[in-house]
Amino acid sequence: MENRVKRVLIVFYLLGLVSLFADMVYEGGRSISGAYLENLAAPPVGPALIGLGDFAGYVLRFIAGYLATVYQSSKLLWGFVIAGYTVTAISIPLLAFTYSWSIAAVLYMVDRLGKGLRAPSRDVIVAEVSEDFGLGKGFGIHELLDQFGAFIGPLVVSVSLIYWGYRTAFLLLLIPGAISIVLVISAFTLYPSLKSVDRVKKPELGFKGLGEVFWLYVLASSALALGFMHWAISSYYLTSRGVMSDYEIGLAYTIAMLVDALVAIPLGHVFDKIKLKVLLIQPPLSLLYIVILLYAPRELIPLAAVCWGVIMCSEESIMRASIALIVEPSKRPLAYGAFGLLYGLTWAIGGFVYGFLLGNNLHVLTFAVATNTVSLLLYIKLSNKYEINTSNLK
């Protein structure tokens, strides 16, 4: 028993390190995606194609999650995880050999497909190996390591560009990519059989069994996604209005990422204490972010970045932990896939709406108030319903 606990803990940290090194590759490559496409003489549609890759990745999350739920195979789940990380580890460094903007855009899209393939199964495994010491804490530590890689990757690429150029910058990302593959295979070797899969004798098809609480959670989170402004839109607004320079916007984003990393473990700890009630902080923070962005003096923009960073952290930690809390283990792959698709779709729709309304601050604020208010009310209902269901089981 003691050996199993140690092995599970080792696998947990291995998966965290896998995300760290894989994010060095992904974020390192993404940090210069627009500049690299421009360097290859790409038209404005070039960067937009990368956005299509993000959407395709969300669709693949659902497909991978559905297949993992139907077949209930530990090997299949691990296969999706290993294949997904391998795709990222290869596709981004291959950019070093591209001379066509279209091929470069395709490689960026392929990377997003890799994330879509691995994400639901990875979250299932992280949830399982975190249960002994707390889902919130587990996903919080995982997000902290993930963000550490997201910080180091762009830094390595930036330094490489100064001294050696694009090709060397991309080739250097082969190193963390190779390390991520070795680590994820090591994790599989140590923990090849998932108890959440092996205990299921006959898999259920379809969405039956996800439960009313899960769909209420999806509705609340989708409303949040509609009202949560993407950083790209925010930075466009700040630039077009002359509020901040490019350098200052980049610095504000760095603050957001730093906050994301710093609050990951504390937020996870709070989640383990009060469960779904911690989700209630998100809609007010999302609305506060919009208010500061639109109406506050430029000196307070860093405070907006803090709000944005906390919400992003919650999306990558406690929102993932919430699914593991409210969905039975055998249904988690499908739940993660369905949630990822719907959340990503509504966030994209919200982005288009904000882009359309951006010329009128009052309209932007009205949309933000409406969506975040709905989200808050649904999260309150969700929290109450979860507590009632939990008390009935005692």
Question: What does each model-identified segment do?
Answer:
Residues L60-K75, L161, V263-K275, L358:
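Helix-to-loop junctions at the C-terminal end of transmembrane segments
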Residues P44-V45, D132-H142, D246-Y247, P329-F339:
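Loop-to-transmembrane helix entry/capping segments in MFS-fold secondary transporters
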